[in-house]
């Protein structure tokens, strides 16, 4: 296939990826967006195969591995529960980074196969491209592995910090720049392998100081890194589809990270440099004696809901862990049969990845027009009769507005405390991932429901009926 014809099809593929992003921006058009993305990827892969023009034995191996990898990916995605989606995303990000590293290694060791020159005589611009792609890919891989381990519970979700951490990260960052310079000058293998090794280490050190509550931002940031790694390798391979795709993923991930940082009153550059969410708890709530709380049960909750005219549901990570989304949908359907207005309030960083709660509610077939973002619904809490908080801790904590010493101070929260009655479903009074005691627990209008989120919701349904 001619280069001009390939470029046209790659452009079509890029347009389909843009349409996919547009479709995925709304639940109503998400299926259509997913279809555009699949179609664009099929076109890109097919044209890449046809452009090679050499159907040798090695090419057949590539096809076999492609089908094997695609089948495994489809099987994993099909089998994985929705509650484990954050770690699945982190795992896939790691594979994107590792793929970029492998392509860079292949191009460096065998440049003739990529029309980049000969060993020791690689084009200068190609060296820069593969160096950046390999470095960002290595950081993405190791960072995503740490994120996966934290999300999976294999590694502690608490921030891991040590003295001089930021200085070490700075030193490693400078070392990477110096190594890229010397690699382009000397084309030495030792500099190339050192670059990859230090990049792996830096990716690890950037993520370990980040707390579990801040994982949604980490996931979107790693998504951005994987995109830029792919774009860098796209330049090396002179593959316009890979460049377009990488740029789309990289820019969209960076924009999403910035938006989420604003939603948490955090610094965007802290995310990039690491140490995000590692602030130790100095809140005045820490160390205080435990205050008395009002404790209720499913019967109390059902009574309050039956006598309400409007109810707002605030889902959080606790709902995901308990897999309570289907029971929650059933409870809401019961309330609506009694002419009670029900809506869902979603905080932008609720859960462990961007859109985590939206995905779970969509799985339970919750109507899209009942789901509202923070800015859309925050003013409605003051007029609501009952708020049902199901596992959403830090994003409902009033200390974000009242306690300047709190690690979450300044973070926009859902104004749950303004509601007439707050039903808070939680296993215990333990703080959330931010490590801050929630003032909402001790408010006069709060009734604590200590139980598994799914079991409590099911008990409420029984009492409603």
Give the positions of each predicted feature:
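Cytoplasmic-side transmembrane-helix entry/capping segments in multi-pass membrane proteins
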Residues: 31-40, 62-63, 84-96, 159-171, ...
């Amino acid at each position: 296939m001619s280069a001009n014809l390939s470029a046209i099809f790659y452009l079509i593929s890029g347009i389909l990826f843009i349409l996919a992003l547009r479709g995925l921006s709304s639940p109503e058009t998400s299926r259509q967006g997913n279809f555009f993305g699949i179609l664009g990827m099929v076109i890109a892969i097919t044209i890449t195969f046809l452009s090679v023009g050499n159907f040798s034995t090695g090419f057949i191996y590539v096809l076999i591995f492609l089908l094997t990898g695609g089948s495994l990916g489809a099987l994993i995605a099909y089998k994985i529960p929705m509650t484990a989606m954050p770690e699945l995303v982190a795992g896939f990000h790691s594979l994107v980074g590792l793929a970029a590293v492998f392509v860079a290694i292949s191009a460096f060791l065998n440049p003739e196969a990529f029309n980049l020159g000969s060993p020791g005589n690689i084009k200068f611009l190609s060296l820069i491209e593969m160096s950046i792609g390999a470095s960002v890919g290595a950081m993405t891989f190791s960072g995503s592995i740490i994120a996966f381990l934290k999300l999976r519970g294999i590694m502690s979700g608490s921030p891991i910090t040590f003295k001089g951490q930021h200085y070490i990260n700075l030193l490693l960052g400078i070392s990477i720049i110096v190594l890229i310079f010397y690699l382009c000058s000397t084309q030495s293998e030792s500099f190339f392998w050192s670059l990859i090794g230090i990049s792996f280490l830096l990716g690890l050190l950037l993520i370990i100081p980040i707390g579990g509550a801040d994982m949604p931002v980490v996931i979107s940031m790693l998504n951005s890194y994987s995109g830029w790694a792919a774009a860098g390798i796209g330049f090396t391979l002179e593959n316009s589809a890979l460049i377009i795709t990488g740029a789309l993923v990289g820019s969209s991930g960076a924009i999403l990270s910035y938006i989420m940082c604003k939603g948490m009153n955090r610094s965007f550059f802290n995310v990039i440099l690491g140490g995000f969410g590692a602030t130790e708890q100095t809140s005045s709530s820490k160390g205080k004696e435990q205050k008395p709380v009002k404790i209720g049960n499913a019967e109390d909750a059902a009574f309050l809901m039956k006598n309400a005219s409007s109810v707002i549901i605030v889902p959080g990570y606790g709902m995901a862990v308990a897999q309570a989304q289907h029971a929650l949908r059933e409870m809401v359907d019961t309330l609506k049969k009694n002419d009670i207005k029900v809506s869902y309030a979603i905080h932008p960083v609720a859960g462990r990845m961007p859109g985590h709660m939206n995905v779970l509610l969509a799985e339970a077939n919750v109507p899209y027009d009942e789901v509202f973002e923070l800015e859309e619904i925050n003013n409605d809490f003051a007029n609501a009769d009952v708020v049902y908080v199901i596992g959403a801790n830090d994003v409902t904590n009033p200390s974000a507005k009242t306690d300047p010493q709190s690690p979450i101070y300044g973070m926009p929260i859902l104004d749950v405390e303004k509601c007439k009655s707050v039903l808070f479903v939680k296993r215990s009074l333990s703080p959330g991932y931010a490590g801050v005691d929630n003032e909402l627990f001790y408010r006069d209008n709060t009734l604590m429901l200590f139980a598994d989120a799914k079991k409590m919701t099911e008990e409420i349904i029984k009492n409603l009926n």
